[in-house]
Amino acid sequence: MKKILSIFICFSLIGILSFTNSCKKDNKIKGCTDKDSYTYNSTAQEDDGSCLYQGAVVIWYDQAASTGLIADGATALTFYLSGEIVGSTATSVYWTAAPACGDNASITATEDLAKVKTHAYTLSVKDQTGYEYWTTVLNIDANTCLQFQLLWSARKK
């Protein structure tokens, strides 16, 4: 009888331990583990697909472009990224070197890239009459500032 009781207790303990271990929860902290994401979670141990990204571009031109635009009759420029206005400025305003994203009076656009780390946008620059001086495709990358210079080449309306 004592032997049967010992066997019963032994199997009961094995059953309880097996049940307890099978119900053990995964205690890993889930979140965004990519440092390029603005939703990065430094305490996350497992990526859960929640990473979201942003990238920026600053569009600028120098004195040569300003002089050419003014000589061509352009007094103001409007900047579009994929059809959306991101800024405007007088053609007499120019930079002697590339500005940083967000610099005062710069044409800076911060774009939501959603769950991708790079996205292509169409840049269009038009004057006050709607004449398009520049059009190109820009690839904006996550967690970066693209400094894009508009280069002047003689154009006639």
Where are these regions (language model features)?
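Bacterial N-terminal signal peptides that target proteins for export
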Residues: 1-9
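Bacterial Sec-dependent N-terminal signal peptides
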Residues: 3, 15-57
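Exposed beta-strand and adjacent loop surfaces of beta-rich binding modules
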Residues: 56, 74-76, 118-122
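A short, amphipathic beta-strand motif
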Residues: 57-65
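Short, acidic Ser/Thr/Gly-rich low-complexity loop/linker segments typical of extracellular
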Residues: 84-108
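A short, solvent-exposed beta-strand micro-motif common in secreted/extracellular proteins
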Residues: 105-131
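Structured interaction patches on ligand/partner-binding surfaces of diverse proteins
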Residues: 124-157
